[in-house]
Swiss-Prot record:
Keyword check for Zinc: yes
Subcellular location: Nucleus
GO BP annotations listed: nervous system development; regulation of transcription by RNA polymerase II
Protein's name according to its UniProt entry: PHD finger protein 10
Domain of life per record: Eukaryota
Name of the encoding gene: PHF10
Region (Essential to induce neural progenitor proliferation): 1-97, 204-246
Source organism of this protein record: Bos taurus
TM stretches of this protein: none
Keywords (A to Z) from UniProt: Isopeptide bond, Metal-binding, Neurogenesis, Nucleus, Phosphoprotein, Repeat, Transcription, Transcription regulation, Ubl conjugation, Zinc, Zinc-finger
Region Disordered: start-end pairs: 199-282
Pfam families in alphabetical order: PHD (PF00628)
Compositional bias segments (type: Basic and acidic residues): 257-271
Keyword Coiled coil in record: no
């Protein structure tokens, strides 16, 4: 609104001084020319400075301080709107009279098909726009942004039907949902006491201990380490007076297998497999020009200065003299009957895992590795220890004839 016209309509001489807080600005030259073309202002007013006011502020001022003027102004606006609608209707009726055409009855079905086709195209475009451009919308009543729900596969009704006892509400109550555990799974659960430790990933590399610590543990006797010994259950199966072949030393209690310090670091070995019994027809591995990992000599000479064949690991390229590995002749003949593993590749026969080296012990007859917790032992036994695969049959007792009543006593 123009400030000059408002002040004239309200009868206020100095409108700017009376209402200085109203927002106002000066009209540009183009705006004055536009108002002159609409006959809103005169040519004299076009040369003068004119000021524009905000319409909403002026109407609020009229409602508060000039209610009579505002009522008169509202009536004038309604008359103008009514006149505009009437003029628009007259123009529309004149256009209809000028463009009046008679529609043939035979073309009505064609027009109906065209109208239906256009309506279908409009609906398809509207739905496509909703799905691509306006998927989410803001709900003015709840002030929540509504997002379309994703598509999910629906199961058949019989698969999702709830039973009469779906879940126990109190401890000990019957329910139809339960899990059946296999014997191997139950060994990991603490029913009375868990028999197995948490399973380890077989693909994880085994932790290798330092070689210096192995040498230090060799002289500790029955202390922790990869020692071999006899448990109470198997100590009676081997006689203490049983002799050993000449040239072989009796293994010390609690001894450990010396690690191959000078051997090259082994590469990624293939997946290990548990070997519980001798493999029929097994042929030992043959590596020409192999060197012992301890004394760094071939089969022509050992650390004792004698020619001695080497034993080879079935998993890697490590080799060693039986005397350097503290092996007896019986043990050497036994390890040739199955794929023998060196200390670097040794795995448990029961679980097939190389982990928990501090709990690994070895049979004194076949040199197979076992975890203490896999065979039900709480700790590594001291002395000699023999696995179940190598347990010897107990000696058959000799039959002694009964003495008669008339027998003589010597």
């Amino acid at each position: 609104m123009l400030q000059e016209q408002v002040s004239e309509y309200l009868g206020v001489t100095s409108f700017k001084r009376k209402y200085p807080d109203l927002e106002r600005r000066d009209l540009s030259h183009k705006e004055k020319l536009y108002l002159r073309e609409l006959n809103v202002i005169t040519e004299t007013q076009c040369t003068l400075g004119l000021t524009a006011l905000r319409s909403d502020e002026v109407i609020d001022l009229m409602i508060k301080e000039y209610p009579a003027k505002h009522a008169e102004y509202s009536v004038i606006l309604q008359e103008k709107e009514r006149q505009r609608i009437t003029d628009h209707y007259k123009e529309y009726s004149q256009m209809q009279q000028q463009n009046t055409q008679k529609v043939e009855a035979s073309k009505v079905p064609e027009y109906i098909k065209k109208a239906a086709k256009k309506a279908a195209e409009f609906n398809s475009n509207l739905n496509r726009e909703r799905m691509e451009e306006r998927r989410a919308y803001f709900d003015l009543q709840t002030h929540v942004i509504q997002v379309p729900q994703g598509k999910y596969k629906v199961l058949p009704t019989e698969r999702t039907k709830v039973s009469s006892y779906p879940v126990a509400l109190i401890p000990g109550q019957f329910q139809e949902y339960y899990k059946r555990y296999s014997p191997d799974e139950l060994r990991y659960l603490p029913l009375n006491t868990a028999l197995y430790e948490p399973p380890l990933d077989p693909e994880l590399p085994a932790l290798e201990s330092d070689g210096d610590s192995d040498d230090a543990e060799d002289g500790r006797g029955d202390e922790k380490g990869k020692s071999k010994g006899t448990s109470d259950s198997s100590s009676g199966n081997v006689s203490e007076g049983e002799g050993l072949p000449e040239g072989q030393e009796e293994p010390l209690p609690g001894r450990q297998r010396p690690r191959d310090k000078a051997a090259a670091p082994r590469k990624d070995a293939p997946k290990r497999s548990a070997l519980s019994k001798a493999v029929p027809g097994h042929k030992p591995k043959v590596i020409p020009n192999a060197l012992c990992g301890i004394c760094l000599k071939g089969k022509e000479s050992s650390r004792r200065g004698k020619a001695e064949p080497l034993v080879h690991c079935s998993q890697c390229d490590n080799s060693g003299h039986p005397s350097c590995l503290d092996m007896t002749m019986e043990l050497v003949s036994m390890i040739k009957t199955y794929p023998w593993q060196c200390m670097e590749c040794k795995t448990c026969i029961i679980c097939g895992q190389p982990h928990h080296e501090e709990e690994m012990m070895f049979c004194d007859v076949c040199d197979r590795g076992y975890h203490t917790f896999c065979v039900g032992l709480g700790a590594i036994p001291s002395g000699r220890w023999i696995c179940d695969c190598c347990q010897r049959a107990p000696p058959t007792p000799r039959k002694v004839g009964r003495r008669g009543k008339n027998s003589k006593e010597g």
